[in-house]
Amino acid sequence: MKTYYEKDANVDLLQGKTVAVVGYGSQGHAQAQNLRDSGVEVVVGVRPGKSYEVAKADGFEVMSVSEAVRTAQVVQMLLPDEQQAHVYKAEIEENLREGQMLLFSHGFNIHFGQINPPSYVDVAMVAPKSPGHLVRRVFQEGNGVPALVAVHQDATGTALHVALAYAKGVGCTRAGVIETTFQEETETDLFGEQAVLCGGVTALVKAGFETLTEGGYRPEIAYFECLHELKLIVDLMYEGGLTNMRHSISDTAEFGDYVTGSRIVTDGTKKEMKRVLTEIQQGEFAKKWILENQAGRPTHNAMKKAEQNHGLEKVGAELREMMSWIHAPKELVKK
């Protein structure tokens, strides 16, 4: 595994260049501010609206996406996956110049062919492995979060060096930047989200909650046992792996882990995981998601509404009112 650190990157490669950060959401605001604090000239390309005003208030020169691309030598695409291809076609493609670098923090649109940059530009990825607020906070504390780096197209012969300079400007070389490919990052990221982090976990939590409530137990108790305490366990795994978690829980819980876990996640579950991975690798999920967006998201919106009305959500909202240490956001935001 090739990993790059501070000594392997030179942020001075960005001196005399302008970086255009396209999008000013969670990652956009963090990466733009970190780069600026590292002495890099940054402009923000967004359409008029809330993000435009926030970027202006943060002191950036804000302009249209097309103008930002014309101004910059390095263009970082930090829009949501489903918006990138349209914005690229409408505002970026015709403004690209020979020798520019087009950067991404997720490989979806390049890997699945939704964006096909011309051969005369560099195409690379710098993907911090943390949400934007953490990218910014850790940087301000003098540290950094790990990241992935990949080069899809090296027109200039310096794509990796410039990508590492960008990663250093964001603060990621302080922690370590791991070399990967667009294919590996995209396919593993989608699989992790679907099979484990989002799809797998939410299905497991709901199934546990439903099993207890259908067995006659009160929803409030089921919520605590199947959702609320999940954070306690995940934090232990996050800090020191499965061994640390098992060392920290009771012996009763640890024994139950060993003898019961494989009854829940069975060989059949793993076979289904492999099917999910194959669908991702073959582009079936990407095609489904692209078509879903083109159709106005009817399935997505219907499923989202149904999930929001699940009994788990109702009792959870009531119980969280008892928890003074939880500061629920006034509006849900994408991280």
Swiss-Prot record:
GO biological process entries: isoleucine biosynthetic process; L-valine biosynthetic process
Pathway assigned in UniProt: Amino-acid biosynthesis; L-isoleucine biosynthesis; L-isoleucine from 2-oxobutanoate: step 2/4; Amino-acid biosynthesis; L-valine biosynthesis; L-valine from pyruvate: step 2/4
Cofactor note: Binds 2 magnesium ions per subunit.
EC number(s) reported in the record: 1.1.1.86
PROSITE patterns: KARI_C (PS51851), KARI_N (PS51850)
Domain KARI C-terminal knotted: 181-326
Amino acids binding substrate: 250
The organism's place on the tree of life at top rank: Bacteria
EC top class named in words: oxidoreductase
UniProt protein name: Ketol-acid reductoisomerase (NADP(+)) 2
Protein source organism: Bacillus cereus (strain ZK / E33L)
